[in-house]
Amino acid sequence: MLLTQTTTPEDVKALDRAELPLLCGEIRHAILESSAAVGGHVAPNLGVVELTVALHRVFNSPTDKIVFDVSHQTYAHKALTGRAYTYIDPARYGEASGFANPDESEHDLFAMGHTSTSVSLGCGLAHARDLAGDAYNVITIIGDGSLSGGLAFEGFNNAAELDSNLIIIVNDNDQSIAENHGGLYRNLAELRASNGTCERNVFRAMGLDYRYLDAGNDVLALVDALQELRDIDHPIVLHVSTAKGKGFEPAQSDPERWHHVGPFDMATGRKLCPGHPSKPAPRTYADITGEALSAAIERDSQVVGITAATPYIMGFTPELRAAAGKQFVDVGIAEEHAVTFATALARSGAKPVFGVYGTFLQRAYDELWHDLCLNDAPATILVFGASIFGTTSETHLSFFDISMLGALPNMRYLAPACMEEYLSMLSWSLDHREHPVAIRVPGIGLVSRPDLAPAEDADYGVARYNVVRQGRDVAVLALGDFFKLGERVANRLAAEYGIEATLVNPRFATELDREFLDSLAAEHRVVITLEDGILDGGWGERVACYLACTPVRTRTFGIAKGFPDRYDPNELLAQNGMTVENMAAEAVRLLNE
């Protein structure tokens, strides 16, 4: 097996040319086998195997600097830079990060996982090289989907002013996470159709040299093309056409659904339920969101769904997107534009709903502040994956959202504890015309709690906490999807200590029910808060601050500020004192002081 003997760039250079296609086949098979067991970014990685092998054949990493945009497509790169074990040894599957990680290897220059950064990083690397008088190559690889992010164009604009080596490889597979959208992609299609010769050329228009290679999955053709560009003395774009999902028919025929997947059956391509290989995946909040919004779109021509290249998180399948027509807009990987676009829609009488991962909403903070909230536009933002139990890579952490949105005037951030509350809040937000509304979609699986179901005419215009169980002395306020955890704490207080605690479902992540807190302070001696996010600037701190001038003892539970990486969620909770046993004991300790 070539791959077991080819684990460094030097090994790649030592192979005969005829062995390179064989190596590519082995890497592709290893990526598939390991991803079938632990999940991963399957389609993107299968499409760049040949390009990655060619890069390490031609260039001398880490002396030559190679930067993969997003870095979700670095599996082959990792296999060829000392980390093949994570793809060929079942006992070590998933051991290496799914993204670039400088702590793993000197060949990974930056910790990264968000899109459109590579060209800017390349410009910085090239400028630093020139200042130092060095002469190495700087190569960035950016997928065509990442070109829809504004930062990419800021980088291209700056790159055109360099007068030294910078090789920008545009990996064009005619696909973002879902299909591409926007005028840029019409030009890329024209360039592909004309073999790079059409007169209209967005890269040349920005002042960059340009070459095109149609054979983006031919490793020998790629080696030859890169050899010609090695040590070039000016910035150049190499535009290569590749097939996303190359070599695995399910991924190649449906690259959107195979962009990132959990464990799957390699023989059939069927997705598997973790822990229950024979069961299909369960229903999700994405499913019910797609159903609810599709029904709203059918009823009301002013409802507009918006996504930044991730329609699947809102449950919008290709069929639902087609049915919605102009009432569903994919703006590409452009969260900043999505927020400002939604602002104008809302101020013009439409009812926009922007669904976005919490980790990606961070990119649009100024637009949330300056455009949405300053203009008090009644748009709805659905924040997905904002949980300790969401993506655990340090590059995709999503639990800073409560602190982030809580600082914004006019923003109402709702935190449902179950699907019944979520659907009620979503329905209310569509007709709410006074302020921006964000909803923190629960991140710990679909939970049905009919006992928490709001009234049909529920109004979330004023912060009102929901007392689920009335008690005395101790109050447990558990926000959003941590309500169930708070319920367990209250149950333990009763069973272990004989304390009947008041159990509260707050529902509002950035606003306080001051009237309720005043009454709470009059009847309780201890208040503990639980939230699925960081403590600094969080909801619990607001509660504690409000109660600080009362006799009530307050203890906030959440996660310490930091960048935990590939953590076990339950271990992280334990490290932060958030076990049921500890939280109950802490409440009792405060009560007895």
Question: Can you say where each PLM-predicted feature lies in the sequence?
Answer:
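Glycine-rich ThDP/TPP pyrophosphate-binding loop and its adjacent helix/strand module
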Residues: D108-F264, R270-S278, P282, A286, ...
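Cofactor-binding active-site loop characterized by glycine-rich and histidine/acidic residues
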Residues: H41-L162, V303, T317-P318, D457-Y460
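N-terminal amphipathic, basic-rich helices that act as targeting or association modules
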Residues: M1-A79, R204, A215, V219, ...
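Peripheral docking tails and interdomain loops at the edges
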Residues: M266-G275, G390-T392, R412, I534, ...
